Amino acid sequence: MAFFTANSYSQMFEVGAFAGGANFIGDVGKTNYILPNTPVGGLIAKWNRSPRHALRLSLLYAEISADDEKSNDTRRQQRGYSFDNTIAEASLGLEFNFFEFDLSEPQPQSTPYLYTGITYFRADHLWLKNGRANNLVNEGTNWDFAIPMVMGYKEAITESIIGAIEIGARYTFSDNLDGSWPEELLDRREPTAEFGNRNTNDWYVFTGISFTFTFGRKPCYSF
């Protein structure tokens, strides 16, 4: 009579693509938390360490823009600032599954999940180079960190394809993605070019879908 058990979890990998929309939350434009108005896309890789968690790496590129004239805030409408910026980010962290999601098991499988870690990004600095009466100017490069806070839902579409939808906010350590705090660019205070709320940093949000392909080691069995 033979007995057998699985003595290790299938440490399977995933690679794929993410696409969706981005929006900015700061001192220029609308203040909606989730309102995608520009594109974002890139690559995602995961190393599933157990049915409940995975190491995750993503490389994403996005455009962000904001326009005071589209804001519901009368003061911003009267001010009339606007900008366009780009963000290239690398993010590394842990993805936690609410329910067990074992890629070695048969379908159907699905679970909500959370992701967080550390993000390093590149964007343009902006500032009111020609004074408050003029618009924001892109000048210089802003390298900084952010904390990603992501909620999503994923499902095994086939034995080797995983589909997911997610919303992820990035709290940045910068207050100058919108040009409101040019000290980060100039290394000096410039009161005539400062505006907005100094007590809050900038955020950006990615909303989209991903499709990943799985591969890797199946469970080992003892007889």
Name each model-derived stretch.
Residues 53-130, 213-215:
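Gram-negative (and chloroplast) outer-membrane scaffold detector with strong preference
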